[in-house]
């Protein structure tokens, strides 16, 4: 039986998905399963790692049954994952010693405060490209070792293993034969030196993380190990590609050249720009991260995250009940010529890059007696585009590269009003692909390269198909006036703390 399909596993924050991709890069079938969110205290978010694993087994079985494709026809497995979420488990039993601590969780704030107090910010920045923040995996591992009896001692003896979700899934799929991660995920731990490409002894000492528990770091596209037959309908299938979700989306968007960038409009926005084989240190509060490692070399990216994007549209729907469904926001926004001076600063959980202000809160400016819900909805959508421009401007400043086009994906990229305004406020065209499942595609392409389904990046590029290109329609003067108004609104919101 010909092995011509790739199985891509997308382990996300609220659900796990499995997709089967054919040689043309088309999605043949998909299965999805949600799992529970655990909130032990305000600001804490955890997952049951065994439940995540069960959801992965369920979606693998589900997608094979749904498509009537045999496990014998699967050439390889690619994995993409929610980044930074951390699991520590017992090497012998395979049981986690505590829940997985999720990327959103703020429970390690005290550890971060201590690191800042001890003066580690510059060291961390210069070695990892990251900021000290509870977002990243290293402090989560430290928290688990601190809060589970005997964990530190057991970790030092080599009895416990640490991993982000990719590592956990590969370990389970291969029956414990492979304890690995890839460059993209390792670069999100606060423990990995992105220049020397190794776990950094000084950083490990700083957080007192025993080296014995860390996974081996491997390229993003490589045959790592085979699945154990009992997890895969009697087949040993190569696990052959891994990338964190945002890097996978950059790859799935075909952003292979230096200076190419993508924005994923999900709950938040994640912007990544490929900076090639050179790591660009940011002077503007962006993260420097590993994009992927392929063909014996690594490539880097600049990353900026916007905390509130799609969730602002959900707020219009669920909080304010201004729209029945998220897609209605496009119709309301398009009915009027402008927002009439209304600005929404959706800083519900602070502002991310390039402001990094966790104390600022949401605000609305410019309301008059004539303001109606159309202006309010339009201004909320526009805020996503303004924040994207903030980040892209910072990327251009840091990298010295002028953006020529922006590729987009994620739920809100389906909103034509938003995409047109995005193009207008950036002053560059915006390209939306036919297949918006770019994260899953990225994982599939990485695995397919390793097992020979695709020859090289050039062949993969041909599978990127344009759905719509949004050309710039706004005049320069209007663009700058609107953007200046946005900056005034942000400053005013920051002053209100």
Swiss-Prot record:
UniProt organism field: Listeria monocytogenes serotype 4b (strain CLIP80459)
Enzyme nomenclature, EC number: 2.7.1.30
Listed GO CC annotations: cytosol
PTM characteristics: The phosphoenolpyruvate-dependent sugar phosphotransferase system (PTS), including enzyme I, and histidine-containing protein (HPr) are required for the phosphorylation, which leads to the activation of the enzyme.
GO molecular function term, any single one: ATP binding
Annotated ADP binding sites: 13, 17, 267, 310, 411, 415
Pathway assigned to this chain's UniProt record: Polyol metabolism; glycerol degradation via glycerol kinase pathway; sn-glycerol 3-phosphate from glycerol: step 1/1
SUPFAM superfamilies linked to this entry: Actin-like ATPase domain
Name recorded for this polypeptide: Glycerol kinase
Family of the protein in this entry: Belongs to the FGGY kinase family.
Residues reported to bind sn-glycerol 3-phosphate: 13, 83-84, 135, 245
Activity regulation information from UniProt: Activated by phosphorylation and inhibited by fructose 1,6-bisphosphate (FBP).
Highest classification ranks of the organism: Bacteria, Bacillati, Bacillota, Bacilli, Bacillales
Function per UniProt: Key enzyme in the regulation of glycerol uptake and metabolism. Catalyzes the phosphorylation of glycerol to yield sn-glycerol 3-phosphate.
Gene field: glpK
Catalytic reactions of this protein: glycerol + ATP = sn-glycerol 3-phosphate + ADP + H(+)
């Amino acid at each position: 039986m010909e092995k011509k399909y790739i199985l891509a596993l997308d382990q996300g924050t609220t659900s796990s998905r499995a997709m089967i991709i054919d040689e043309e890069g088309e999605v043949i079938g998909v299965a999805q399963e949600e799992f529970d969110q655990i909130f032990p205290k305000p600001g804490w978010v955890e997952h049951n790692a065994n439940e995540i694993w069960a959801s992965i087994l369920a979606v693998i079985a589900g997608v094979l049954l749904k498509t009537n494709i045999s496990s014998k026809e699967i050439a390889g497995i690619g994995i993409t994952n929610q980044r930074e979420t951390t699991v520590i488990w017992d090497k012998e039993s395979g049981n986690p010693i505590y829940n997985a601590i999720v990327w959103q969780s703020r429970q390690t704030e005290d550890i971060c405060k201590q690191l800042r107090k001890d003066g580690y910010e510059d060291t961390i920045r210069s070695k990892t490209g990251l900021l000290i923040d509870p977002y990243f995996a290293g402090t989560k591992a430290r928290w688990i070792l601190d809060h589970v009896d005997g964990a530190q001692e057991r970790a030092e003896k080599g009895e416990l293993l640490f991993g982000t979700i990719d590592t956990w899934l590969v370990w389970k799929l291969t029956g414990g034969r492979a304890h690995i991660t890839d460059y993209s995920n390792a670069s999100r731990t606060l423990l990995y030196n992105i220049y020397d490409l190794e776990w950094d002894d000084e950083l490990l000492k700083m957080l007192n993380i025993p080296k014995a528990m860390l996974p081996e770091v491997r390229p993003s596209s490589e045959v790592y190990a085979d699945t154990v037959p009992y997890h895969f309908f009697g087949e040993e299938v190569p696990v052959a590609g891994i990338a964190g979700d945002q890097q996978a989306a950059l790859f799935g968007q075909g952003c292979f050249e230096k200076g190419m960038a993508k924005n994923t409009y999900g709950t938040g926005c994640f912007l990544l720009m490929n900076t090639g084989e050179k790591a660009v240190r940011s002077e503007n509060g962006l993260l420097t991260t590993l994009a992927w490692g392929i063909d014996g070399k690594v490539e880097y990216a600049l990353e900026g995250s916007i905390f509130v994007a799609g969730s602002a549209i959900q707020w219009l729907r669920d909080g304010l009940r201004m729209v029945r469904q998220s897609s209605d926001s496009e119709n309301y926004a398009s009915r009027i010529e402008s927002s009439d001076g209304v600005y929404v600063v959706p800083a519900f959980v602070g502002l991310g890059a390039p402001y990094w202000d966790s104390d600022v809160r949401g605000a609305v400016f410019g309301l008059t007696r004539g303001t109606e819900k159309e202006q309010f909805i339009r201004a909320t959508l526009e805020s996503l585009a303004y924040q994207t421009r903030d980040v892209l401007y910072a990327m251009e400043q840091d990298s010295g590269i002028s953006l020529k086009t922006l590729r987009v994906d994620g739920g809100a990229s389906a909103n034509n009003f938003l995409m047109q305004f995005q193009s207008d406020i950036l002053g560059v065209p915006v390209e939306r692909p036919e297949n918006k499942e770019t994260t899953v595609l990225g994982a599939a392409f990485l695995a397919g390269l390793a097992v020979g389904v695709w020859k090289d990046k050039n062949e993969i590029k041909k599978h990127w198909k344009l759905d719509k290109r949004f050309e710039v329609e706004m005049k320069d003067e209007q663009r700058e006036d609107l953007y200046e108004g946005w900056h005034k609104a942000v400053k005013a919101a920051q002053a209100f703390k």
